[in-house]
Amino acid sequence: MKDGNIYPYRGKRSKAMIEDRLELNMENGIFIGLYLAEGNSHIKSGKVMICNNNTNILKIVEKWFNKRFIKNKTYVKKNENDYTSTTIQGYSVVLAKFLNKFVGSYSRNKFIPSEFYLAPIDFLIGLMDGYFSGDGTISKNSIEVSSASYELIEGISML
């Protein structure tokens, strides 16, 4: 055990090192933004999933997991229409619980916590970068995002 990290009270012990305080920096902002856009967490299984076909995004998420010694695996599925779906899964009950409580899970239940409104600019830049990389569209005349969560869209617009 290492000071400054959170460990599960029960269950398998792993090498994962989840910090007891989330530093509001660019790296964590990007991860949280990607999670808000493309992620989901399941507490019982301890899975934290981010679905995206962009290899650069998958590498960013894999690096974030690896830095914290979170076991992870990438899954690629092709359907009958030859559409590819890529998901990276990290395995940490502690992280799944944290994300569920801090920013929500499933598209319709996500939100921006009040702590983000006073966050450092680097974190907010990372958050927007991650979020727009997942759910955003930038065209010649507009910048758009979409979400099933009214609270998330409202929170993003207030940042």
Model-derived features: positions:
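Intein-associated homing endonuclease modules of the LAGLIDADG/DOD-type, together
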Residues: 1-159
